[in-house]
A protein has these predicted regions:
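Extracellular/periplasmic head regions of type IV pilus-like filament subunits
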Residues: 64-132, 142-143, 158, 170
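Membrane-proximal N-terminal amphipathic helix
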Residues: 41-66
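Sec-dependent signal peptide cleavage junction
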Residues: 30-45
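N-terminal single-pass transmembrane signal-anchor helix
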Residues: 7-34
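Short, low-complexity, Pro/Ser/Thr/Gly-rich segments in the mature regions of secreted, periplasmic
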Residues: 140-171
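N-terminal secretory signal peptides that target proteins for export/translocation
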Residues: 1-5
């Protein structure tokens, strides 16, 4: 039997070398891709929390101007939870298609009737409790996990701490 001198194809060693190179690339690339995906999820959560604060601010200011602020402590979507303190669920501020998001926004008024907006929110991957606009810019205020947060204003309380001017203005 005569062997032809023009062989075509790859040897087993060449194929194994390619597989090893691809494995090394995957080992290096996968953690970076996973970290990028997690950062994107956290960024999306932060944007949704800011949207909730914005919607609550708009809803509260409209109701305040129209004289229709919540007076009922039994309405769970928008309720008065204390003197100069109000709570709005996500549904109460128009975020009805919220998917996995659960939470609420509290609005507290100081003696000058300047409002402070604080969001308590989870999507079961991340959570934040009582955060203002400024707090959301600090990654330490966004935790992993649900934090036991519900969609109900039943456990909502108003903070007595004095926020900075930017927090009061919602910037």
């Amino acid at each position: 039997m005569k062997i032809k001198g023009n062989k075509k194809g790859f040897t087993l060693v060449e194929l194994l070398a390619v597989i090893v190179v691809l494995a090394i690339i995957m080992i290096i690339a996968i953690p970076a891709v996973v970290e990028s995906m997690n950062n994107a999820k956290k960024g999306s959560f932060k944007i949704y929390a800011q949207r909730a604060l914005g919607n609550a601010e708009s809803t509260f200011q409209s109701e305040d101007l129209l004289g229709t602020l919540p007076t009922d402590k039994n309405d769970d979507n928008r309720k008065k939870i204390g003197d100069n303190c109000y709570c709005y669920t996500l549904a109460g501020i128009g975020l009805t298609s919220s998917g996995n998001f659960k939470g609420y926004v509290t609005v507290s008024l100081d003696d000058k009737r300047e409002a402070t907006y604080r969001v308590t929110l989870t999507d079961n991957s991340y959570s934040t409790k009582g955060s203002t606009y400024t707090d959301l810019n600090t990654s330490s205020n966004i935790a992993d996990g649900s934090g036991g947060i519900t969609s109900s204003c039943a456990s909502a309380t108003c903070s007595t701490s004095t926020p900075s001017t930017t927090e009061q203005a919602g910037n």
